[in-house]
Curated annotation (Swiss-Prot):
Residues covered by region (Disordered): 1-23
SUPFAM superfamilies linked: Ribosomal protein S18 (SSF46911)
Gene transcribed to yield this protein: rpsR
A Pfam entry, by short name: Ribosomal_S18
Family from the record: Belongs to the bacterial ribosomal protein bS18 family.
Example GO BP: translation
Organism, scientific name: Clavibacter sepedonicus (Clavibacter michiganensis subsp. sepedonicus)
GO cellular component, one term: cytosolic small ribosomal subunit
Biased composition (Basic and acidic residues): 1-10
Subunit structure: Part of the 30S ribosomal subunit. Forms a tight heterodimer with protein bS6.
Protein origin, superkingdom: Bacteria
Protein name: Small ribosomal subunit protein bS18
Lineage per the UniProt record: Bacteria, Bacillati, Actinomycetota, Actinomycetes, Micrococcales
Amino acid sequence: MAGKSSGDRRKLLRGAKVGKNAAPAKSIRVGVIDYKDVATLRKFISERGKIRARRITGVSVQEQRLIARAVKNAREMALLPYAGSGR
């Protein structure tokens, strides 16, 4: 058969993301993470209200834990919504 091999497909799938915006937090230096700092926390939340992954934001494991805890506290205090804007 003259089709593409699975190795060729994997290379295509693993390629650079086309059309995506730059990671929002890679240029942000995270200092003190506070649940009351909603403007900073919004940079780590997707449009649907989910906490962005480390591989997207580029923060360390410790910083990701602090961000997740701060986002959850801010949601509990009604500073951030639990769900995003939806459709």
